[in-house]
Amino acid sequence: MDLALFFRNEVKPALGCTEPGAVAYAASIAARHCPGEPLSVALSLSLSMFKNGRDVGIPGTGGLRGNRLAAVLGVLAGDADKGLMALEHIDMAVVERAQTLLDAGMVTEEVVDGVPGVYAAVTLRCAGHEVTVTVAGRHDRVASIVVDGEVVGGEGMERAPEADGTLHGGASCEPSASFTEPPLPAYLEELRECDFAQLWDMAAGIDATLEQELLRGAAMNMAVARMGLESGWGLGVGHTLAAHAEAADLHARIRFMAGAAADVRMAGAPQPVMSSAGSGNHGITATVPVAVAAEGLGVSPRVQAEALALSHLVTGYLKAHTGRLTPICGCSVAAGAGAAAGIVKVLGGNAVQAERAVASLMASLMGMLCDGAKGSCGLKVATAAGEAYAAALLGMDDRGVQRPEGVVNPDIATTARALARLSREGFAAADAVMVELLGGGKH
């Protein structure tokens, strides 16, 4: 597998929550194709995009929240060239104008069925023109750009089969058209076929350039964690836990540092984090526990980098099975599993111990629901970080899950398949109910 390609696409900086970031990105592209004053913006979102963007803070807005705000900010001042960081340079004057347009009812939002988990169609109307930009499959993947009914760009979508079983590809200007998940990139297909020993060996084989990039990403996320400790952003999970912890307690430090970083991100601080598998909170969970353990135990930068690589690879492996956005909390289950494996590497363990740690983590947290991105994600991230360390200790002592326990198996491939089926089939109804509880009708 091309490791450089994996890390370039799966581990990269993101500003704010990636769901409203994707909405803002699509809106900023739409604005390029729609001259004049905006008249209306309509959002058509998947269940997951709706719930993950509903209550999360938007960076640079003073704590304002939501996909609708992200969309109108993207239209007014988004920089499409910056992708998921399209709102990096907005100011309060733009925010005030955006709020005025929101209050006037300019933006509508609806949840649509039959689309991939990552799906947002932004339809912008201005004088004499209508533009629909759709992102799908990945947060920064532009599937289609449709201007006045004509497809002018985008990578295309995979249509769901017709009644006769035929498939039709290509872009559509219908936001509610039925589509399937786009195929995985080749590098993720390769990753899905790996066993754990191969993941372990790949992490050990990173080159000097990847080593430096991984350490840079960890430093970025640790800086965000320290912000959370100093000022108590959001729910103040990390700040509060730190105030009641012994400084020498590594387990507690792993928990409060990870929680603090998520506090900052969910509150909408204008500070980028290094993401993993398309999610900033996944990136925090995959990196901060490993970095804190490495710092506390005084291991070499090389060991830390290999541990970070393993964490991202395990996270990516599990997400390649489940999909980008799921009813199960991927920060806890996928990135938490990655962190457990990475911490075993920091502790000097081997591949067998790391795979057992992954199984133990998943046995603990597999049922944790994702009810959207919001301040309380800090609680889940802190829990996942703490459980990752506990699972790593069990692995190092050759304890934990060593035979099938419920739906969890010591073999990562078997458990990944079970997780994927539970997420896609078992928890699908739960996702729909959660969105109803969150008010996911058109408004």
From Swiss-Prot:
Q: Region Disordered: which residues?
A: 156-178
Q: Single GO molecular-function term?
A: L-cysteine desulfhydrase activity
Alphabetized InterPro entries for the sequence: Ser_deHydtase-like_asu, UPF0597
User: What are the BP-aspect GO terms?
Assistant: L-cysteine catabolic process to pyruvate
Q: Which HAMAP family match?
A: UPF0597
Q: What family does this chain come from, according to its entry?
A: Belongs to the UPF0597 family.
Q: What is this protein called?
A: UPF0597 protein Dvul_2496
Species of the source: Nitratidesulfovibrio vulgaris (strain DP4) (Desulfovibrio vulgaris)
